[in-house]
């Protein structure tokens, strides 16, 4: 079932409207899988959901190892800096998200994957905050959570899916999907 929404500044604001249209009260978590991540492994989504429930987390997301230094220098790719090294089936706290060029001096820099899981009560709180200067300048809505002292937890994805950040990415994904079908 598709749910149409009005215009919103961010995807998170959009999913909250869609969630409200469901008119349900028995859901604890909402998962926002961004449309530019069509190749994400379903097992990683299940792992994120399980970690959210197990840890009673407010917001969770996924990241993968940085396999190439070019990722660190690509402003189309979002990086996440974590408090601790990511390990399988564990959460660690996100310290920052960035599009900027980063050096690998900090070993806790990962390739962020466009998926978020929200506790419904936290999602409602999040969308009622104004967009922050940091969020607007960096074009990263997750910074609104960090700027308002909401903890974002990060889990390690087993694979690093190709996201669609550029026209070249779109062409590459299209070829992969055509091959698989």
Regions picked out by a protein language model, each given a short descriptive name:
Residues 1, 93, 151-153:
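Conserved beta-strand segments of alpha/beta enzyme cores
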Residues 1-33, 37-47:
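Short phosphate-binding loop-to-helix
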Residues 8-13, 67-68, 103, 161-163:
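A short acidic, often aromatic-flanked loop/helix-cap motif at beta-alpha or helix-coil junctions
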Residues 12-15, 45, 94, 123, ...:
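A general structural signal for well-ordered alpha-helical segments in protein cores
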Residues 20-24, 53, 178:
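Residue-level signal for alpha-helix termini/capping positions
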Residues 24-27, 54-58, 150:
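Short, high-confidence coil segments that cap the C-terminus of an alpha-helix
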Residues 40-132:
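Conserved core of the sugar-phosphate nucleotidyltransferase
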Residues 107-181:
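Conserved alpha/beta core of the MobA/IspD/sugar-nucleotide pyrophosphorylase nucleotidyltransferase superfamily
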